[in-house]
Amino acid sequence: MFISCKPTNTRNLVSKEMTAEKLLGNTNYQAICYGGYRANSREIQPTISEIKEDLRILSALNIKVLRTYNVHYEEVVNLLKAITELKKEDENFEMYLMLGAWIDCKNAWTNLQPIHNEESKRNAIEIEEAVRLTNKYPEIIKIIAVGNEAMVKWATSYYVTPNIILKWVNHLQNLKKENKLPKQVWITSSDNFASWGGHTADYHVEDLNQLIKAVDYISMHTYPMHDTHYHPIFWGIKENELQFPEKEKVDAAMLRARNYAINQYESVVSYMKSIGVNKPVHIGETGWATKSNEHYGNDGSKATDEYKSALYYDLMREWSNKNNISCFYFEAFDENWKDAANPLGSENHFGLINLQSQAKYVLWKNVDSGTFKGLTRDGKPITKTYNGDEKALWLDVKTPNSILKN
């Protein structure tokens, strides 16, 4: 099921020549969100050798651009070291980073009331470290993202108003002008489609307009999977599909989910153009979990399973590649620290490969074709979930209950 866009008659540009402008929208350089945590706590950091295993797997899938989220921990430094080591081992190895700097409001993650129009003192440290790393590894880091879903108002524990993101974007753009940061590094913020003006008018403020003008491109997020619960206008079976075989019902539902994501993308483009701006818009994050015991599972919207997840992946890759849009798919590997107290929570199950080194359905064909031959994760070869039994997989695929008008 995995769509791999192998370069055809195209010489891969060497790292020093490669820029964000050349990377983004280039189907020879597929993108993904990456976290290498194996344990249920980020206190246990992935080692350089573990990260190198991950990088070899991703490279085999023709994924060459990774998105990270913060510089709090050793993970990003170890990731940069791992890439550097692999480049020394193989001069043709390529991997680039969209480096995230985490942004919080004042009092975020404390017992105090969050103050959304003031910022955490930690933000300055994040930005300073992002600059240091970018200057140290300019051949790897090609993009800096200021904040992750840092402006969306449902992030009640930490979101900031757009002026705070704008402050740091302008700071980084000024460093480029002062030759204190590589001029070809692109600066953005990676946020929900609503935060970029694609939804309600309460987001349409002048600071957002100035931010859109200040970034080098827009990195927007779209999650139809979450909206199968929160805004399920697209989710369900149409009246004229009720007699379809179950697989066709699911396929039709997933096509509508993909189209819902496209509509959110287009809503951001539309708002951007409405304020007189025309610059690239790429997908900084989208994904579809394979398990959930919450809103999205069998007791909820019946959205999460390996078949639907694989289909969403393929549909999004097909559309984004066709339109030269980079899609940083969420995510490469399952990480169970995200909802450590609830092992079946959806946040733990967005990866293409699980923590048992098993390729989910989306990658079964890659197992068959030998993509992972000789590669291991945590010492284990990459095998298939469900022992490759598609009938067993389909026992976990449920059809949405909702009936939609034709």
Label the predicted regions.
Residues 78-185, 283:
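Substrate-binding cleft of extracellular glycoside hydrolase catalytic domains
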Residues 66, 144, 218, 283-285, ...:
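Conserved, mostly hydrophobic/aromatic
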Residues 10-21, 26-27, 294-315, 319-406:
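Aromatic-rich peripheral "rim/lid" segments of glycoside hydrolase catalytic domains that contact
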Residues 120-122, 151-283, 289, 293:
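Noncatalytic carbohydrate-binding groove/subsite architecture in carbohydrate-active enzymes
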Residues 43-46, 67-79, 105-107, 121-123, ...:
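Acidic-and-aromatic substrate-binding clefts and catalytic sites of carbohydrate-active enzymes
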